[in-house]
Amino acid sequence: MAAMTVQLDMVSAESNIFSGRVAQLQVSGTEGELGIMPGHAALLTSIKPGMARIVKQDGSEEVFYLSGGILEVQPSSISVLADVVLRAEEIDEQAAVEAKRRAEAHMANAGADFNYAAAAIELAQAIAQLRVVETIKKNISR
């Protein structure tokens, strides 16, 4: 018996990143972690910066970094619209470490006109990218 699947289309501002049948999508919504499987109730929510994990029809997995965006779930399809989508292997770990360090330094030395919200977003994105890299490293070492 074939595994139940649903059509997933994941796009960034630049291109179509993934289009195919999946058994499951795991993503971080603004209200918490979401696990979307075939037959899930209709849903429209914001996505926060973090990891998206897909389980393909053949059982293999693929991991992505999403900078945030919108998730739409319909009975027969899932759409992920994100500003930036990176495959895990495309993440520059050193650049993410530097961005995290820079954001933390800005927050520690904040002046009266400091844009705390922008620094918090930069920090959250860097931490999310590093979590994706860490997850991939753990899976490789198994």
Curated annotation (Swiss-Prot):
Function (record text): Produces ATP from ADP in the presence of a proton gradient across the membrane.
Keyword Membrane attributed: yes
Main subcellular location of this protein, as a coarse class: membrane
Protein name, as recorded: ATP synthase epsilon chain
Cellular compartment(s): Cell inner membrane
Originating gene: atpC
Keywords: ATP synthesis, Cell inner membrane, Cell membrane, CF(1), Hydrogen ion transport, Ion transport, Membrane, Transport
Keyword Ion transport tagged: yes
Molecular function terms, GO-annotated: ATP binding; proton-transporting ATP synthase activity, rotational mechanism
